Amino acid sequence: GIGSGCLGTAYSARLAGLPVLVFWFIVTGILTLFSMMYVAETTLRTRTLVQLPGLAERYLGPAGSILIFIAVVINSLSCMIVYFSGSGNILNELLGVPDWVGTLIFLIPAAGVAWFGLKAMGVGNKLMSIGMIVMLVVLTAASMIAKNGDLSRIFQSNWTYAIPIFNVAAFSYIGQYLVPDLARGLSHEPKKLAPAIALGQLIVCVLLIIVPMGVMYITPAEDLTQVATIAWGRSLGLWALYIANIFALIAMLTSYWAISQTLLSNIVDKFKFHSDEDVKIRLPITIVIVGIPLALTLSGAVG
């Protein structure tokens, strides 16, 4: 998924520069791909389709399972907090509504589609992915021909800030816990799993580089915003403000769907509930995994 990582990297790397960011995107992309392939192989070797904590319990024992489960929960909730917060900022910019109202508007399609599970998300992702690619091509092309563009900005670098950027790049790629769900979706064609992961990782890498490159090319470092598309739109004009931020909302939305479904499946697997499609199980878990990040975002406890 392209979500908080893609949209926050330009701001995070404003002191280090694009070359440092690209270097870490390539390194962490390769490392993450290796780990995802390892998880994919382990998943396919395990006859029962289980989530990452289930695999860890089988091969690493109970302690490993608990640690992996905690990591999945923390990372998933962190991403969802960023999506709720970022969507509020974007809709405030576009519609002039308070941030908390924007967050609640985002919540409707985010939680609504996620409720119906993998099939609904699959259809939504296909349609929105095409739209995202078209919008990204338009924005990037407009950036390259913009009068306020400055090529020197994308070549500036300060390796003193390289280490913190590693963390940003690694966070952008984290998706190993999505692999068991991919295996579940391709259980009838297991040979397609590894190529699908590799292609997906390549596409993510390209998108992760294009977004900050386009933003940094037309925006001075001191004017970069935490959500990249806000600065992108301000630099290109009103039309771009809407396109860029609709792109951002779609990116957050599709990532939210994947992460929320995976977190739900991990909880069901860890506590050995019989199915994540049972309403009596799905409803209370959904309320919890939506309610925690939503409450933290609206309360201002995190930002």
Regions found by a protein language model. Give the residues of each.
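Membrane-interface "cap" regions at the ends of multi-pass membrane proteins
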Residues: G1-Y11, A16, L33-M37, L49, ...
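Hydrophobic transmembrane alpha-helices that form the core helical bundles
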Residues: F34-V97, L241, N245-F271
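Loop-to-transmembrane helix boundary motifs in multi-pass membrane proteins
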Residues: W100-I105, L199-L207, P212, M216-T225, ...
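Helix-loop-helix junctions that connect adjacent transmembrane segments
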Residues: D99-I105, P109, G117-K119, V123-G233
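TM-loop-TM module centered on a large, flexible mid-protein loop between adjacent transmembrane helices
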Residues: R47-P62, Q201-L253, A301
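Transmembrane alpha-helical segments of multi-pass small-molecule transport proteins
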Residues: G1, F69-V73, E93-G117, G131-T140, ...
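Transmembrane helix-loop junctions in multi-pass membrane proteins
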Residues: G5-A10, M80-G88, A110-G122, I145-L151, ...
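Extracellular loop-to-transmembrane helix junctions
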Residues: A10-E41, T48, P53, I203
